[in-house]
Protein backbone atom coordinates (compact mmCIF):
# COMPACT_ATOMS: atom_id res chain seq x y z
CA UNK A 1 0.00 0.00 0.00
CA UNK A 2 1.31 3.50 -0.86
CA UNK A 3 0.09 5.23 2.26
CA UNK A 4 -1.57 4.89 5.65
CA UNK A 5 -4.75 5.98 7.37
CA UNK A 6 -4.46 8.67 10.00
CA UNK A 7 -7.11 10.46 12.06
CA UNK A 8 -8.11 13.94 10.96
CA UNK A 9 -8.87 16.75 13.37
CA UNK A 10 -12.58 16.00 12.91
CA UNK A 11 -12.12 12.34 13.73
CA UNK A 12 -12.59 11.25 10.13
CA UNK A 13 -9.82 9.02 8.71
CA UNK A 14 -7.77 10.65 5.98
CA UNK A 15 -5.28 9.14 3.58
CA UNK A 16 -1.69 10.28 3.95
CA UNK A 17 0.95 9.44 1.36
CA UNK A 18 3.88 7.47 2.74
CA UNK A 19 6.96 9.71 2.91
CA UNK A 20 9.09 7.50 0.67
CA UNK A 21 6.43 7.59 -2.05
CA UNK A 22 5.83 11.37 -2.01
CA UNK A 23 7.80 11.83 -5.24
CA UNK A 24 5.74 9.24 -7.12
CA UNK A 25 2.51 10.74 -5.75
CA UNK A 26 3.41 14.24 -6.97
CA UNK A 27 4.46 12.90 -10.37
CA UNK A 28 1.16 11.05 -10.72
CA UNK A 29 -0.82 14.18 -9.89
CA UNK A 30 1.24 16.22 -12.35
CA UNK A 31 0.64 13.66 -15.10
CA UNK A 32 -3.09 13.60 -14.36
CA UNK A 33 -3.28 17.40 -14.47
CA UNK A 34 -1.48 17.52 -17.80
CA UNK A 35 -3.86 14.92 -19.19
CA UNK A 36 -6.89 16.90 -18.06
CA UNK A 37 -5.54 20.12 -19.55
CA UNK A 38 -4.95 18.42 -22.89
CA UNK A 39 -8.51 17.08 -23.05
CA UNK A 40 -11.27 19.26 -24.61
CA UNK A 41 -13.40 21.03 -22.02
CA UNK A 42 -16.60 19.89 -23.67
CA UNK A 43 -17.82 17.87 -26.62
CA UNK A 44 -20.67 19.83 -28.16
CA UNK A 45 -22.83 18.74 -31.03
CA UNK A 46 -25.08 20.48 -33.51
CA UNK A 47 -28.06 18.63 -34.94
CA UNK A 48 -29.22 19.47 -38.46
CA UNK A 49 -32.71 18.11 -39.11
CA UNK A 50 -33.03 18.67 -42.84
CA UNK A 51 -35.26 15.78 -43.81
CA UNK A 52 -33.36 13.04 -45.62
CA UNK A 53 -30.16 15.07 -45.21
CA UNK A 54 -30.21 15.16 -41.40
CA UNK A 55 -26.80 15.09 -39.74
CA UNK A 56 -25.15 15.62 -36.37
CA UNK A 57 -21.91 17.57 -36.27
CA UNK A 58 -19.37 17.46 -33.45
CA UNK A 59 -17.24 20.48 -32.57
CA UNK A 60 -14.02 18.77 -33.65
CA UNK A 61 -15.42 17.83 -37.07
CA UNK A 62 -16.70 21.35 -37.71
CA UNK A 63 -13.34 22.86 -36.80
CA UNK A 64 -11.81 20.56 -39.44
CA UNK A 65 -14.48 21.28 -42.08
CA UNK A 66 -13.02 21.90 -45.54
CA UNK A 67 -14.63 25.37 -45.68
CA UNK A 68 -13.80 26.55 -42.16
CA UNK A 69 -11.99 29.88 -42.03
CA UNK A 70 -11.25 32.78 -39.72
CA UNK A 71 -13.75 35.61 -40.08
CA UNK A 72 -14.05 39.03 -38.49
CA UNK A 73 -17.50 40.25 -37.47
CA UNK A 74 -17.94 43.97 -36.91
CA UNK A 75 -20.49 45.16 -34.35
CA UNK A 76 -21.26 41.65 -33.15
CA UNK A 77 -24.87 41.64 -31.90
CA UNK A 78 -24.15 39.61 -28.77
CA UNK A 79 -20.72 40.91 -27.77
CA UNK A 80 -21.30 44.53 -28.90
CA UNK A 81 -17.83 44.74 -30.43
CA UNK A 82 -15.70 43.36 -33.23
CA UNK A 83 -15.12 39.61 -32.84
CA UNK A 84 -13.01 37.02 -34.66
CA UNK A 85 -14.26 33.47 -35.10
CA UNK A 86 -13.44 30.17 -36.74
CA UNK A 87 -16.56 29.61 -38.81
CA UNK A 88 -18.15 27.61 -41.61
CA UNK A 89 -20.54 29.17 -44.15
CA UNK A 90 -24.05 28.12 -43.12
CA UNK A 91 -24.82 27.44 -46.79
CA UNK A 92 -22.15 24.71 -46.77
CA UNK A 93 -24.06 22.84 -44.04
CA UNK A 94 -27.56 23.11 -45.51
CA UNK A 95 -27.36 20.17 -47.88
CA UNK A 96 -30.53 19.77 -49.92
CA UNK A 97 -32.10 23.02 -48.70
CA UNK A 98 -33.71 25.32 -51.28
CA UNK A 99 -34.21 29.07 -51.13
CA UNK A 100 -37.97 28.75 -50.57
CA UNK A 101 -37.56 26.41 -47.59
CA UNK A 102 -38.13 27.54 -44.01
CA UNK A 103 -35.70 26.87 -41.16
CA UNK A 104 -35.72 27.19 -37.40
CA UNK A 105 -32.58 27.63 -35.30
CA UNK A 106 -33.12 26.48 -31.71
CA UNK A 107 -30.87 27.57 -28.83
CA UNK A 108 -30.14 25.78 -25.57
CA UNK A 109 -32.28 28.27 -23.61
CA UNK A 110 -35.42 27.82 -25.76
CA UNK A 111 -34.84 30.74 -28.12
CA UNK A 112 -36.25 29.64 -31.50
CA UNK A 113 -35.39 31.82 -34.49
CA UNK A 114 -37.71 31.38 -37.48
CA UNK A 115 -35.69 32.02 -40.62
CA UNK A 116 -36.37 31.81 -44.35
CA UNK A 117 -33.66 29.74 -46.02
CA UNK A 118 -32.84 32.22 -48.79
CA UNK A 119 -30.66 34.62 -46.72
CA UNK A 120 -28.86 31.68 -45.11
CA UNK A 121 -27.91 30.33 -48.53
CA UNK A 122 -26.35 33.61 -49.68
CA UNK A 123 -22.65 33.47 -50.51
CA UNK A 124 -22.37 37.18 -51.32
CA UNK A 125 -23.48 40.33 -49.54
CA UNK A 126 -25.01 39.45 -46.18
CA UNK A 127 -23.60 35.99 -45.48
CA UNK A 128 -24.47 33.67 -42.59
CA UNK A 129 -21.74 31.75 -40.78
CA UNK A 130 -21.75 29.12 -38.07
CA UNK A 131 -19.11 30.26 -35.59
CA UNK A 132 -17.57 27.36 -33.67
CA UNK A 133 -16.15 27.74 -30.18
CA UNK A 134 -12.86 25.88 -29.86
CA UNK A 135 -12.68 24.25 -26.39
CA UNK A 136 -8.97 25.07 -26.33
CA UNK A 137 -9.70 28.74 -27.03
CA UNK A 138 -13.00 29.53 -25.28
CA UNK A 139 -14.87 32.72 -26.12
CA UNK A 140 -15.47 35.41 -23.51
CA UNK A 141 -18.57 35.31 -21.37
CA UNK A 142 -21.53 37.36 -22.59
CA UNK A 143 -21.57 38.94 -19.12
CA UNK A 144 -20.25 38.16 -15.66
CA UNK A 145 -23.18 35.88 -14.86
CA UNK A 146 -23.65 34.32 -18.31
CA UNK A 147 -21.67 31.78 -20.33
CA UNK A 148 -20.23 32.48 -23.78
CA UNK A 149 -22.24 32.55 -27.02
CA UNK A 150 -20.93 29.07 -27.83
CA UNK A 151 -20.58 26.33 -28.54
CA UNK A 152 -22.24 27.36 -31.84
CA UNK A 153 -23.32 30.86 -32.85
CA UNK A 154 -24.98 32.00 -36.08
CA UNK A 155 -23.28 35.23 -37.12
CA UNK A 156 -23.34 37.44 -40.21
CA UNK A 157 -20.84 39.36 -42.28
CA UNK A 158 -22.25 42.49 -43.95
CA UNK A 159 -25.71 42.06 -42.34
CA UNK A 160 -26.69 45.57 -43.39
CA UNK A 161 -26.86 44.36 -47.00
CA UNK A 162 -30.02 42.38 -46.24
CA UNK A 163 -31.48 44.16 -43.19
CA UNK A 164 -30.65 41.22 -40.91
CA UNK A 165 -32.29 41.68 -37.49
CA UNK A 166 -30.69 40.86 -34.09
CA UNK A 167 -33.12 37.95 -33.72
CA UNK A 168 -31.39 36.32 -36.69
CA UNK A 169 -28.16 36.00 -34.67
CA UNK A 170 -29.06 33.05 -32.39
CA UNK A 171 -26.28 31.98 -30.04
CA UNK A 172 -25.78 28.72 -28.11
CA UNK A 173 -27.45 27.01 -31.07
CA UNK A 174 -28.23 23.33 -30.54
CA UNK A 175 -30.16 22.49 -33.70
CA UNK A 176 -31.29 23.79 -37.08
CA UNK A 177 -34.48 22.28 -38.50
CA UNK A 178 -36.34 22.43 -41.78
CA UNK A 179 -40.00 23.05 -41.00
CA UNK A 180 -43.18 24.18 -42.69
CA UNK A 181 -43.63 27.97 -42.75
CA UNK A 182 -44.94 29.65 -39.60
CA UNK A 183 -48.34 30.42 -41.15
CA UNK A 184 -48.90 26.70 -41.81
CA UNK A 185 -47.69 25.47 -38.44
CA UNK A 186 -49.44 28.10 -36.32
CA UNK A 187 -52.74 29.31 -37.84
CA UNK A 188 -53.58 31.01 -34.52
CA UNK A 189 -51.02 33.67 -35.46
CA UNK A 190 -52.76 34.60 -38.69
CA UNK A 191 -54.55 37.93 -39.07
CA UNK A 192 -57.95 38.15 -40.74
CA UNK A 193 -57.66 36.20 -44.04
CA UNK A 194 -59.72 38.91 -45.75
CA UNK A 195 -56.78 41.31 -45.44
CA UNK A 196 -54.60 41.78 -48.51
CA UNK A 197 -50.88 40.99 -48.49
CA UNK A 198 -49.97 44.69 -48.65
CA UNK A 199 -52.22 45.62 -45.72
CA UNK A 200 -50.19 47.11 -42.82
CA UNK A 201 -51.49 44.37 -40.51
CA UNK A 202 -50.34 41.62 -42.88
CA UNK A 203 -46.97 43.30 -43.17
CA UNK A 204 -46.88 43.58 -39.38
CA UNK A 205 -47.36 39.81 -39.16
CA UNK A 206 -44.22 39.31 -41.26
CA UNK A 207 -42.33 41.69 -38.97
CA UNK A 208 -43.62 39.83 -35.91
CA UNK A 209 -42.21 36.58 -37.28
CA UNK A 210 -38.84 38.16 -37.94
CA UNK A 211 -38.42 40.16 -34.74
CA UNK A 212 -40.64 38.70 -32.01
CA UNK A 213 -41.43 35.03 -32.55
CA UNK A 214 -37.96 33.87 -31.54
CA UNK A 215 -38.77 34.76 -27.92
CA UNK A 216 -42.56 35.09 -27.72
CA UNK A 217 -45.67 33.09 -28.48
CA UNK A 218 -49.00 34.62 -29.41
CA UNK A 219 -52.37 32.94 -28.80
CA UNK A 220 -50.33 30.07 -27.37
CA UNK A 221 -48.81 29.50 -30.81
CA UNK A 222 -45.08 29.27 -31.45
CA UNK A 223 -42.11 27.22 -30.32
CA UNK A 224 -40.28 29.83 -28.23
CA UNK A 225 -39.96 29.26 -24.48
CA UNK A 226 -38.20 32.49 -23.63
CA UNK A 227 -40.68 35.35 -23.22
CA UNK A 228 -44.38 35.76 -22.35
CA UNK A 229 -47.30 35.23 -24.71
CA UNK A 230 -48.17 38.50 -26.46
CA UNK A 231 -51.93 37.99 -26.60
CA UNK A 232 -52.99 35.69 -23.77
CA UNK A 233 -54.24 36.68 -21.31
CA UNK A 234 -53.67 40.23 -22.60
CA UNK A 235 -52.00 41.89 -25.54
CA UNK A 236 -49.49 44.61 -24.62
CA UNK A 237 -51.70 46.92 -26.70
CA UNK A 238 -54.36 46.47 -24.00
CA UNK A 239 -52.23 47.78 -21.13
CA UNK A 240 -49.83 50.09 -22.98
CA UNK A 241 -50.81 53.15 -24.98
CA UNK A 242 -49.43 52.96 -28.52
CA UNK A 243 -46.74 55.59 -27.87
CA UNK A 244 -45.52 53.90 -24.71
CA UNK A 245 -45.54 50.47 -26.35
CA UNK A 246 -43.37 51.78 -29.18
CA UNK A 247 -41.05 53.38 -26.63
CA UNK A 248 -40.88 50.07 -24.76
CA UNK A 249 -39.98 48.16 -27.94
CA UNK A 250 -37.29 50.71 -28.74
CA UNK A 251 -35.76 50.61 -25.24
CA UNK A 252 -37.40 48.28 -22.69
CA UNK A 253 -35.17 49.53 -19.87
CA UNK A 254 -36.43 53.09 -20.33
CA UNK A 255 -39.83 52.09 -18.92
CA UNK A 256 -39.13 49.02 -16.80
CA UNK A 257 -35.66 48.62 -15.39
CA UNK A 258 -34.51 45.51 -13.55
CA UNK A 259 -31.16 43.68 -13.46
CA UNK A 260 -32.41 40.42 -15.00
CA UNK A 261 -34.21 42.04 -17.96
CA UNK A 262 -33.50 40.11 -21.16
CA UNK A 263 -35.48 41.84 -23.90
CA UNK A 264 -33.23 43.82 -26.26
CA UNK A 265 -34.23 47.15 -27.72
CA UNK A 266 -34.95 47.50 -31.44
CA UNK A 267 -33.22 50.54 -32.88
CA UNK A 268 -34.46 52.59 -35.82
CA UNK A 269 -31.80 50.92 -37.97
CA UNK A 270 -33.21 47.48 -37.16
CA UNK A 271 -36.90 48.38 -37.05
CA UNK A 272 -37.66 51.66 -38.88
CA UNK A 273 -40.53 53.81 -37.60
CA UNK A 274 -42.87 52.67 -40.37
CA UNK A 275 -42.18 49.01 -39.60
CA UNK A 276 -42.70 49.61 -35.87
CA UNK A 277 -46.11 51.13 -36.66
CA UNK A 278 -47.05 48.02 -38.69
CA UNK A 279 -45.91 45.68 -35.92
CA UNK A 280 -48.08 47.50 -33.38
CA UNK A 281 -50.99 47.42 -35.83
CA UNK A 282 -50.64 43.64 -36.06
CA UNK A 283 -50.58 43.27 -32.26
CA UNK A 284 -53.62 45.54 -31.94
CA UNK A 285 -55.46 43.55 -34.60
CA UNK A 286 -54.65 40.23 -32.92
CA UNK A 287 -55.98 41.50 -29.57
CA UNK A 288 -59.38 41.09 -31.22
CA UNK A 289 -58.55 37.57 -32.42
CA UNK A 290 -57.75 35.82 -29.15
CA UNK A 291 -57.94 32.06 -29.09
CA UNK A 292 -60.34 30.82 -26.41
CA UNK A 293 -58.66 28.48 -23.96
Feature-to-residue mapping (PLM):
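Axial heme c-ligation environment in periplasmic c-type cytochrome domains
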Residues: 225-231, 251-280, 286, 290-293
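N-terminal signal peptide c-region/cleavage motif recognized by signal peptidases
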Residues: 38-40
